[in-house]
Every structure is written in structure tokens, then in C-alpha cells.
């Protein structure tokens, strides 16, 4: 069974994460984050953001380039954030002790390696940035010899990072991305908004609105309820 570092280095979806680890270790001698994640006795839980998660963070911070280009995303983040902030973000995405999803659900307040906490609610993780969509767990319980990895679709942030501006309602809902199995995001709501022609009105930055936004799980419950209540026309 491989270590946490070996798993991250061996999967293309974690290229930006590995590059960030290497950058911090080089820029801050003695940090040795890669070494810590390789240690046989590390016993860590890592919430590992995908490349797409880092791309979304770059976009949130004002990157107008290609957020699917891993090299460009890494370069933007390195230029936009102090190395100490990148280090703290990485440490905030890790916790001492290997924790399965069941253990996280039983004890949802999680102490991280940078001294702050995150809170789990189902598969949603609440961080310290009040402006951006909270990360969701998209794959869980990946076992390593020295801990466990849970894959997340956005980067956990220990602070309200400068440069990230509040998006419009449409921006926030569209950030969910393409249709997937994550019931905590807003793929179905976005489709409904687009289908009804409301996307433009809800994208107006001067609109002063409160929106009660049902997530995908809520829409699926509605569909199931409507199916149960529909009349049976079978012969």
C-alpha cells in the first residue's frame, strides 16, 4: 500500500497539490511537507483538493486564464498568494490521525494541522472563508500506509483570502460545475434557472435578493415525491 505522497504523486488529478507541496518545501527550507506526508508513522487525514478545485480557487482570486491548465493555475496561485499562506492552506487541508468518513460524521469538528478547525455536515466541509462555496467530499476513505485521503472539490481555506470577491447568485450556482453525483451542489438548480430564462436577472450584480437555494438532493426528493403522488394510468 502506498503512502499519502505516493498516492498524490501517482494520480494526475493531484498535480497542482503536489506542485504546491514542492513549491512550499523549496521556498521555505525546513518545512518538508512532502516528507511529512511520506513518513511511515505520519498517521494523517488529508482532504486532497483536485486540480479542478485549485483551478476554481484561482478563478475566485481573479485568474482570467485557463483554469484547466495545471501549470498556469500553479503559477497564478504562487504569484497571487504569499508562500506562507499557501503553506497554511495546505496544513489546513490535513488533520492528525487517520479518520474515516464514519469517524468524521461521528465527530464533525476536525482540528487541522494549522491549528484551526473545519466542520463536517454530511459530505460538506465548512471552512473559515465566508464568501466561497464550501468544499464537498467527492471520494472518501482512500487508504494509505500512513493515513487516509478524502478527495474534495474545492480547497479548504483557513482565512478569508484577499482578492476573492463575492459572486452573483448565478456565479455561485454555476461554480458547482457539470452534473455529478454530489447531492450538496446546485447542478439541477442551475439547469432550472437557465431553462426558465432567469440566469441573466440573477447574474445582475445590483440585484438585492435573498435566494433559498435547493441543492440537488432536494430536487431529487421532490422528483421522488412527485413520482409517488402521480396518478397510475396503467391498464
Kindly give the residue locations of the regions a language model identified.
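Mature, structured domains of secreted/extracytosolic soluble proteins
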Residues: 1-235
Amino acid at each position: 500500500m502506498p503512502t499519502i505522497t505516493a498516492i498524490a504523486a501517482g494520480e494526475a488529478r493531484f498535480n497542482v497539490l503536489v506542485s504546491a507541496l514542492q513549491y512550499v518545501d523549496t521556498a521555505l527550507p525546513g518545512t518538508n511537507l512532502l516528507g511529512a506526508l511520506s513518513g511511515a508513522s505520519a498517521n494523517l487525514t488529508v482532504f486532497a483538493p483536485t486540480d479542478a478545485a485549485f483551478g476554481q480557487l484561482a478563478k475566485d482570486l481573479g485568474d482570467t486564464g485557463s483554469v484547466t491548465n495545471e501549470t498556469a493555475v500553479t503559477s497564478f496561485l504562487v504569484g497571487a498568494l504569499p508562500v506562507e499562506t499557501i503553506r497554511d492552506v495546505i496544513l489546513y487541508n490535513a488533520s492528525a490521525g487517520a479518520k474515516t468518513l464514519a469517524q468524521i460524521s461521528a465527530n464533525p469538528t476536525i482540528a487541522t494541522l494549522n491549528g484551526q478547525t473545519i466542520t463536517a455536515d454530511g459530505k460538506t466541509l465548512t471552512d473559515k472563508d465566508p464568501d466561497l462555496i464550501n468544499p464537498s467530499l467527492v471520494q472518501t476513505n482512500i487508504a494509505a500506509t500512513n493515513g487516509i485521503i478524502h478527495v474534495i472539490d474545492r480547497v479548504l481555506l483557513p482565512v478569508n483570502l484577499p482578492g476573492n470577491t463575492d459572486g452573483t447568485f448565478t456565479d455561485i450556482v454555476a461554480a458547482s460545475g457539470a452534473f455529478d453525483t454530489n447531492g450538496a451542489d446546485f447542478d439541477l438548480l442551475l439547469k432550472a434557472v437557465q431553462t426558465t430564462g432567469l440566469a441573466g436577472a440573477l447574474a445582475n450584480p445590483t440585484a438585492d435578493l435573498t435566494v433559498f437555494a435547493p441543492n440537488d438532493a432536494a430536487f431529487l426528493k421532490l422528483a421522488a415525491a412527485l413520482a409517488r403522488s402521480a396518478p397510475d394510468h396503467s391498464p
